[in-house]
């Protein structure tokens, strides 16, 4: 088995296109302690992908709700006109 070295260089546009096409996940965890006392903890998960890539992934693992796909989004009610509604 031999190692092949690519002599082609990639432009920034090609790298970004590849990342958006395949997606990338960066999972980071850092903890700063002094004398056993935790001062700072950082947890981060960054996902970079195109909307098309996420939709293909969500459909493959069943994250998309069937009722939204079949019936569309539900109608908005006007019970609280002028008041923004947020739900989590």
Curated annotation (Swiss-Prot):
Q: Could you confirm whether the keyword Oxidoreductase appears in this record? A: no
Q: What happens when the gene is disrupted?
A: Required to make gas vesicles in E.coli in the absence of GVP 1.
A Pfam family that the UniProt record links to this protein: Gas_vesicle
List where this protein forms a coiled coil: none
Q: Which GO terms describe its molecular function?
A: structural molecule activity
Q: Give me the segments passing through the membrane.
A: none
* Source organism superkingdom: Bacteria
Where is this gene product found?
Answer: Gas vesicle shell
Please provide the record's keywords in A-Z order. Gas vesicle
- Identify one Gene Ontology CC term for this UniProt entry: vesicle membrane
Q: How is it used?
A: The minimal pNL29 gvp locus overexpressed in E.coli can be filled with Xe and used as a contrast agent for ultrasound and magnetic resonance imaging.
Sum up the protein's function in the record's words.
Answer: Gas vesicles are hollow, gas filled proteinaceous nanostructures found in some microorganisms. During planktonic growth they allow positioning of the organism at a favorable depth for light or nutrient acquisition. GvpA forms the protein shell. It is not clear if the 2 type A proteins in this organism are functionally redundant.
Query: What is known about its subunit structure?
Result: The gas vesicle shell is 2 nm thick and consists of a single layer of this protein. It forms helical ribs nearly perpendicular to the long axis of the vesicle.
Name the protein family.
Answer: Belongs to the gas vesicle GvpA family.
Task: Please state what the protein is called.
Answer: Gas vesicle protein A2
Organism from which the protein derives: Priestia megaterium
């Amino acid at each position: 088995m031999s190692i092949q070295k690519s002599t082609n260089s990639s432009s920034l546009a090609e790298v970004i296109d590849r990342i958006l096409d395949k997606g990338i996940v960066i999972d980071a965890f850092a903890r700063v302690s002094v004398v056993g006392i935790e001062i700072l903890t950082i947890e981060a998960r960054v996902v970079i992908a195109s909307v098309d890539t996420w939709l293909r992934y969500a459909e493959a693992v069943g994250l998309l709700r069937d009722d939204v796909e079949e019936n569309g989004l539900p109608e908005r009610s006007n019970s609280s006109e002028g008041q923004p509604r947020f739900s989590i």
